[in-house]
Amino acid sequence: MKRRTLLRSSVALGSGILPRLSIGGELFHPDSATAIDQAHAELWRRFVDGYGILVDFCDLEGKVNLPTPEECRAGKPNALGWFQPIENGAMFNGLYLDAALNRWRATKSEEDAAKVRRLVEGLLLLNSISNVKGFVGRGVSTNGRSHYPMGSDDQTGPWFIGLWRFYDSGLATDEEKDRLRRHLVETTAAIVSLGWNMPAEAPFGKRGTFEGFHFEKAVRKLFVMKLMAHVTGDTSWEERYRAELETAGGEPALTKRQYATGGMRYFYAPTHAWTSCVAVGALRCLWEMEEDSSLKADYAAGLRASAILAAECLPLAEKFDPANPATFSGDWRSAMMPLWKEQTTEQEAVDLAIAQVKAFGKISPRRNSEANFIREPSAAAWIVSLCPDPRILRDHLPAIGRLIRRHDYARLHYVTFFWVETAWWRMKDIPV
C-alpha cells in the first residue's frame, strides 16, 4: 500500500468545530462529541448482550440471530465459531474496556462504572464456561454457557488486556483484584503448560499461540509476562520477561525486543489493523508498565511505527457509502449451513469457514463493506491514538475526526465501529 500524507489541521479532535468537508461525502455529525455520544448509545442499545458480552452483528433494532446450544456443541456453522454473531466477544470486550474505562475516568459516574463492570463480568464468564482450564471462549449461546470449542490468541490477548486495564484502573476493589488475579494466574499457567498455546476443547486441544518471532507474537507474550510480574509480585516473572526480550529468532533473526521496537507489520492481508491492534494495545500496556528508560523508549518507537503504518488505513473510511443499498442479512444459517460437515481438526474447521464466508458474503454484501471501510479504519484510529508521541497524534487528528463524524451509527450492523470510541477518549483533549 502506498503511504499517504495526511493534512495537518489546526482544529482539535474534541473541539466540536472540525469543518464540514465534501471529500468522500458529507459528514453526518456536526462534531466529534455528538458522534461519540451516538456511537456509545448504539453500542449499549444493540450490541451488549444479556451477559455483558459484545456480539458481532445484529439488525437495526438489536435483534441477534444467535446459534443454539446444540449448534455450538456440533460445531455449526463451524467449530471455530467464525462469521456468526458470537465470534469475537472476548476480543471486542477486552479492547472496548479501554474506552469504557477512559469514559469512567472522565465522568466518574456510577452508570459508567457499572458498564465497566458489566464488560469485565462478560470476560470472566468467558473464562468460566469450559471444563478446560485456561479456556477463553468467544461468546455464549442463548443459555449463557454453550459455546464453540476453539478460541484463539486474538481472543485471549484482548482478554488479558481488558482485565489488566480494569485491575490497574483505580476502579477495581481489593476483592475484585483478588478475583481477577485468580483468573489471570490460572489461565496463564494453562497457556504456559501448552507451550504458550491457547487451550481448546476436544478434539482440538489447542488453537493459537503467543510463541513466535513476529511483532504480534513477541509483544503478546512479553505483555503477559510483565502483567504477571505486576499482579503476582513473583520476581521470577520479571526475570523471565527480561530473558525473553533478548531471545532471538525468525527471518531475519531479531530479538523480541527488536520486534517490539519495529512495530506492527501486515502479513496475511494488505492491511489487518483490526487484528494487529491487539498487539499494539499490549505494547501500549508494556510502555506504561516499563520503568527502564531505554526499554520504554524502544516501546515508544514501536508505538510510533505502528501508528504511522496504521494511519495509512484512515482514508478507507471515505470509501464507505451510507447510501449504497448493499443488503445486510443476519441469516448466516441459510448461506453457511448447506456447506457444513463435521470437523475434527483445526484446519478442517478453517477450510470450512473460509468457504462459508464467501457464501455468506453473497447474501449479505453489507458485511464486506463494513469490514473494509468501517472496521479497518476504526481500528487504525485506535492504533494511532495509542502512540505516546503528541506530534504523531496531532498529524492525524483531522483524519480521525472526519472518520468519527462520517457515520450514522444507528445504521451500522456490525459492532466494529466501537474503536472510534476507544480512539476518541484517548485523543479528545490533545492540544493542537
Question: Which residue stretches match the model-derived regions?
Answer:
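Elongated scaffolding segments in large macromolecular assemblies
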Residues: 174-311, 315-320
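Low-complexity, Ser/Thr/Pro/Gly-enriched N-terminal "stalk/linker" regions
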Residues: 12, 25-88, 117-118, 122-139, ...
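Aromatic- and histidine-enriched alpha-helix N-cap/loop-to-helix transition segments
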Residues: 84-98, 150-161, 213-223, 271-282, ...
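Terminal, non-catalytic domain-edge segments
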Residues: 25-46, 171-173, 279-432
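Carbohydrate-binding/catalytic loop surfaces
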Residues: 53-85, 132-152, 200-220, 258-285, ...
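N-terminal export signals
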Residues: 5-25
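Hydrophobic core segments within long, regular secondary-structure runs in both alpha-
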Residues: 32-44, 97, 113-127, 160, ...
